[in-house]
A protein has these predicted regions:
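FMN-binding flavodoxin-like domain, especially the glycine-rich phosphate-binding loop
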Residues: 2-36, 43-172, 228-253
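Charged, low-complexity surface patches
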Residues: 91-92, 181, 209
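A mid-sequence, solvent-exposed acidic-amphipathic segment
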Residues: 157-194
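Iron-sulfur cluster-binding cysteine motifs and their immediate structural context
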Residues: 178, 187-205, 211, 215-232
Length: 253
């Protein structure tokens, strides 16, 4: 049985959660990163007997449409699947049921789900440092529990998950921009998964293409990208919702 990690991780938190979870399943796994430029996307070859861990970030209670689109290009061959929704210490709302529906429609056999925390991708003070050492231990224990269930031989039932169908309405933005510290090095343009940043003029941002994933913000060597004064407004609005430490959750069929 080969372990596949399929992650859409613009700022690194989702990938880190996936790695920690898989550390409890198997020492070695194959990672496919979906948050890359389209021409760099390399889809995995999955066999029916493999175990696939699909991890996505939560944006306002939903998962990114681009992540869904790219997962839909993966041939599942009926492989066993674990879905992981990673959120920034606010709420995951309908993300898990959306991932369940998408993965099931793609032919995966979804037998377990995890809701886990990482630093908020915009307001980094919320969930700061997560996944931390305590999360690492817990996520590894989740991985061991999942492996035990998969290898146990008992038939799987339909996984019951919290969330609503139909899903809540998604939203877009805020969109990051470059400030006066931008050196036009082009790193952001080379890393943007949608091509929203021009390589010829990295200070220009196409908001029709931008999904607000903050990939460009996380990779900028000059720390010259962000959402400006909107950060203070958003942080104040989120503070009562993100103040308390949220728990990680495991669901197994």
């Amino acid at each position: 049985m080969t372990i596949h990690q399929i992650a859409f991780s613009p700022t690194g938190g989702t990938r880190r959660v996936s790695e920690l979870l898989c550390s409890g399943i198997e020492a070695k796994s194959i990672l496919t990163e979906l948050c890359v430029k389209e021409e760099e996307l390399c889809l995995p070859s999955i066999a029916a007997g493999d175990l696939v861990v699909v991890s996505m970030p939560v944006y306002a209670g939903r998962v990114p449409a681009l992540a869904v689109e790219r997962l839909n290009a993966v041939e599942s061959n009926g492989a066993t699947c674990v879905i992981v929704a990673v959120y920034g210490n606010r709420a995951y709302e309908d993300a898990l049921v959306e991932m369940q529906d998408v993965a099931t429609a793609q032919g995966f056999n979804v037998v377990a789900a995890v809701a886990a925390n990482a630093e908020h991708s915009i307001c980094r003070m919320y969930g700061a440092g997560r996944p931390d050492a305590a999360d690492a231990r817990e996520l590894a224990s989740f991985g061991r529990a999942i492996l035990e269930r998969v290898q146990g031989g008992k038939p799987f039932g339909r996984l019951a998950l919290p969330g609503n169908r139909p899903y809540k309405q998604g939203c877009s933005g805020p969109f990051p921009v470059a400030n006066q510290d931008c050196t036009e090095c082009g790193v952001c343009a080379s890393q943007c998964p949608t091509g929203a940043i021009s390589a010829d003029n990295p200070k220009d941002n196409n908001n029709q293409l931008c999904i607000g994933c903050m990939r460009c913000v996380s990779v900028c060597p000059s720390h010259a990208r962000g959402i400006g004064e909107s950060l203070k407004v958003l942080a104040a609005r989120l503070e009562p919702l993100c103040r308390d430490r949220k728990k990680n959750e495991l669901f197994v069929s």
